Amino acid sequence: MLSYQWDHQAQVMRVYDMLTRLGITCWMDVKSGMGADIYEGMANAVSNASVVVCFMSEKYQQSANCMLEVKFAKQSGVGMIPVMMEGSGWRPSGWLGLITAGSLWVRLSDESQFEENIRQLYGQIQGMVGAALAIEEVSDE
């Protein structure tokens, strides 16, 4: 699932397209549909996700809906990969700083390294999804 604040929609759409081409199934509100009830749509997207990729920015941190998605993902035990969308002048604080503390960020603020950073994101997603599948296999036995 791709969680983002709408100011970064064009960049996240580009990430969606690249990950999809690499074989990653992604959920993005404008691509996958939110449904009539935004909160039900968000909850379903998080509940059905193996990992939530949160595209962090100052406006993301200020968004009540982004906060709900990330907190619900954390409470549901869904893995999270933070992606930094801002330059070096901003860092997450408050609820977002707490939830992402200790996480390895992918940085998408530098356009010149976009493809390299997408490969890093792809590797992190593969690592988390692979670990989730291994846990499911063990619990099924």
Per-range role (PLM):
Residues 3, 29, 54-57, 83-84:
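Conserved beta-strand segments of the P-loop GTPase G domain that flank and frequently precede/overlap
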Residues 49:
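An anion/phosphate-binding loop that grips the pyrophosphate of nucleotide cofactors and donors
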Residues 1-21, 64, 85-141:
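C-terminal interaction surface of TIR/SEFIR-family domains
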Residues 34, 58-78, 88-94:
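Conserved TIR/SEFIR loop-to-helix hotspot centered on a Trp-containing motif
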Residues 26, 80-81:
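Hydrophobic anchor at the start of a short beta-strand
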